[in-house]
Amino acid sequence: MSKIKPAKGAPYARILGVGGYRPTRVVPNEVILETIDSSDEWIRSRSGIQTRHWANDEETVAAMSIEASGKAIADAGITAAQVGAVIVSTVTHFKQTPAVATEIADKLGTNKAAAFDISAGCAGFGYGLTLAKGMIVEGSAEYVLVIGVERLSDLTDLEDRATAFLFGDGAGAVVVGPSNEPAIGPTIWGSEGDKAETIKQTVPWTDYREGGVERFPAITQEGQAVFRWAVFEMAKVAQQALDAAGVAAADLDVFIPHQANERIIDSMVKTLKLPESVTVARDVRTTGNTSAASIPLAMERLLATGEAKSGDTALVIGFGAGLVYAASVVTLP
């Protein structure tokens, strides 16, 4: 009987670089109010959102990803040819096949890197980060590019008072590579498929194709149910991630939750009893909810503005449609 040779990977993995891309068009709440009966004050009080970015025709999922990835690769101090795998998390690449990751890998100039898409909604970045960590430790890649990218404006119903103001577009990317010490903690992840109706696409693509519906599919959600789930259940998941990493809330430097809603963020901070010394990402105010892109975009902005620094210990958690979630403690690049 032949024995399979064991893989030889790095002892640990870490985030080496981060990059982001926000579309050029900035959309204030006043534009949203043209199609819904609401007010700027109501939107801000309910979500914290003041503006969001919407992509133009040239700012495709692939184009935004390439821009963000180029910055992440440069920040990591490597070349595109060294990237061994490209993982893209998105729900707004409207071709079932091929995966947009293959186009991105090619246009970046990788050397035939493995490339694939994943669909895990707003938790997608955490899922991709976990896969990348495993690939590096297992030895199937030395450097992995993880991208979260969305054009949620394409799936926004501007007449839906509950969601019209929420969503934005953008791309965030990180390079994950080898490390001699732990820098990405254990992932606490999972799904609650019994709550699938809480956040969903209004109708399947096939219904639209067959003429069964007149309106283009959009994302809808049960706002109160999502809020309660995020505040009460996701705070527990975040605490589990801290416990698994052996890090106390008082020892954190940064908290980067999915940028869904500032009220949710505030409630999680309170439930986790985070001290005032912890920097909390609030990119949602000017970027809106960008689903899979929200965590890397928020991470990039904190580092760019100096609110966080390389080497800081950060708790990251994503949660959304599925319902799915993923949380871990990481060292910032």
Curated annotation (Swiss-Prot):
The active site is at 122, 258, 289. Inhibited by thiolactomycin. Catalyzes the condensation reaction of fatty acid synthesis by the addition to an acyl acceptor of two carbons from malonyl-ACP. Catalyzes the first condensation reaction which initiates fatty acid synthesis and may therefore play a role in governing the total rate of fatty acid production. Possesses both acetoacetyl-ACP synthase and acetyl transacylase activities. Utilizes both straight and branched-chain acyl-CoAs. The order of reactivity with the various acyl-CoA substrates at saturation is butanoyl-CoA > acetyl-CoA > 2-methylpropanoyl-CoA (or isobutyryl-CoA). NCBIfam families: fabH, PRK09352.1. Its EC number is 2.3.1.180, 2.3.1.300. GO terms for molecular function: 3-oxoacyl-[acyl-carrier-protein] synthase activity; beta-ketoacyl-acyl-carrier-protein synthase III activity. This is Beta-ketoacyl-[acyl-carrier-protein] synthase III. InterPro entries: ACP_syn_III_C, ACP_syn_III_N, FabH, Thiolase-like. The keyword Cell membrane does not apply. Belongs to the thiolase-like superfamily. FabH family. Keywords: Acyltransferase, Cytoplasm, Fatty acid biosynthesis, Fatty acid metabolism, Lipid biosynthesis, Lipid metabolism, Multifunctional enzyme, Transferase. Gene3D superfamilies: 3.40.47.10. GO terms for biological process: fatty acid biosynthetic process; secondary metabolite biosynthetic process. It comes from Streptomyces glaucescens. The keyword Metal-binding does not apply. One of its GO terms (cellular component) is cytoplasm. The last Arg residue of the ACP-binding site is essential for the weak association between ACP/AcpP and FabH.
